[in-house]
């Protein structure tokens, strides 16, 4: 249940106070009389909630959410819509924007590694070496400057070598094609690059890999 009206809709079905659930927090409560774990999390870049319940209760709960949320404009959506939202928000997809061959330093997730702790962990030595020497590649955002749609695996040509689009789509919010790409580290924000787009070359601009948050354009 995601979006600016998620809280108001959830309040219709539970005695708990959704506004008091902190971001990334959770609470055990009843939703429409069904025992649930409700977390203030999501994969859309919007405020919202994820509701966990027994599989046997899921269909009835889904239908009740749609029924009670109708007057507030609730709409069901699928993975395609969610993927567009997460890409607009710059949220990575494992197996596409990152995998076991990509370090956190190469995909904008260095903040998840606690280098300040003395605690050993698998890969620490290698990451510390990369941190000191500098990562040879980085994850950036792209905005296409001409008609077309960015898609995964398209080749990106920069002044410092080649890269590759990892995720791409058309952004309904920005009304332009956007994507995430892994490119050489020397590439900087604002530079133009060339993307191989279905047999032709198209220009794109390098931007921060976060395009939209809470419905507001960032790039």
Language model feature labels by segment:
Residues 1-219:
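Conserved, structured C-terminal
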């Amino acid at each position: 249940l995601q979006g600016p009206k998620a809280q108001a809709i959830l309040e219709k079905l539970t005695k708990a106070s959704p506004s008091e659930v902190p971001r990334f927090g959770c609470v055990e409560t009843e939703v429409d009389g069904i025992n649930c774990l409700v977390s203030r999390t999501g994969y859309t870049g919007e405020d919202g909630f994820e509701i966990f319940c027994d599989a046997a209760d899921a269909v009835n709960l889904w239908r009740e959410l749609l029924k009670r949320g109708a007057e507030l404009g609730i709409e069901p959506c699928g993975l395609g819509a969610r993927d567009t939202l997460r890409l607009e928000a710059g949220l990575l997809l494992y197996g596409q924007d990152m995998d076991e061959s990509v370090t956190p330093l190469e995909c904008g997730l260095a903040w998840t590694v606690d280098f300040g702790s003395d605690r050993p962990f698998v890969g620490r030595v290698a990451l510390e070496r990369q941190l000191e020497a500098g990562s040879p590649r980085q994850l950036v955002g792209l905005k296409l400057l001409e008609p077309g749609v960015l898609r995964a695996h398209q080749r990106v040509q920069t002044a410092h070598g080649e890269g590759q689009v990892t995720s791409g789509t058309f952004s309904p919010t920005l009304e332009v094609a956007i994507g995430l790409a892994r490119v050489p580290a020397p590439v900087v924000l604002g530079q133009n690059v060339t993307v191989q787009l279905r047999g032709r070359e198209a220009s794109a601009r390098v931007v921060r890999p976060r395009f939209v948050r809470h419905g507001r354009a960032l790039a």
